[in-house]
Amino acid sequence: MRRGTRPTAKLLIVAVACAALVVGLVGLGFGLISRMNGSASDSVDEALTAIGDDPQAALEYLAPEEDGNVDEDGTWVPGQTTTDRWAMLTSRNWHKHTPGLDALTAAIGAASSFRNRAPSETDPDVSATADARATYACGRAMSYFGGEEFTKKSFTDIMKRNLAVVAANSSEDVSTAAINGALGAGATSAGLEATDISTLIYRFGDHQDAMTTLATGLGQYHHNKLKEAMNDPDANENDLRDEYHQVAASSSYLQTLSEFRFADDKKKDSEEQKTTVDTSLSVLNAVSSAGLTALTDEAAAPALAFTTGSTIAKPLI
């Protein structure tokens, strides 16, 4: 518990679960709404809002630690409670309660902060299953919000910012999609379809803050990979070139998807497009290469061109 007046994560989870139960009972015809002040939908929205800035509570709600296990491949296998919870969330008529989507995406964004984290001396309170559970939640979210249930008009500015956080914390998946975007299903280790990832990014591709957030996360991912390659005594020039090739692919991927969005909005070559694209690409390239010249004895990074525009399947609008 981070503040003395804040409810515990368990109490927050109970609140959300109870609200979800009410929604389920109403759907079965019990008519509980008539005996409540306000709607059951409002209760779900409020409960999700309560965990939106509490990463641990959000992760526990979206992928409860006691309801599943990590398989031999490191993948989270959810139990029935988790499966039912996601079924409720993804079948709810959110279009009648758009503010609820702001709260849901905030909770998912908070939970995504556990990706690529493991217990350590500097992070001792992290669960050993947190990364796998967060990866599961992010995968479900990117598939859902990048799927046919939504269009570009469904996304509020808040949703765009929140989902950009999810994508930024899932940079390994985004990078894989950037390289293998034409391959479709199974493009990432999480089994996500490349088109879902592309569509998700396309839908917030007109938002400068969202694209900058994604570029920052993606840049940090590539920075770490480049640093690993440079520090590996067994690595050769081709290994390093491959990593720079990945950076170029990611850069072109973001540019293409953002430009797709502006073109569809009849804003091609607008000042807004130029600012959004230029800012995000500058951030990605700056973060990915920050401080790395010292590791290569001041040698310049190779300039690699990579064009993905012809290989990215047109995203769902």
What annotation goes with each model-predicted range?
Residues 1-15, 22-317:
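Non-catalytic all-alpha helical scaffold/repeat segments
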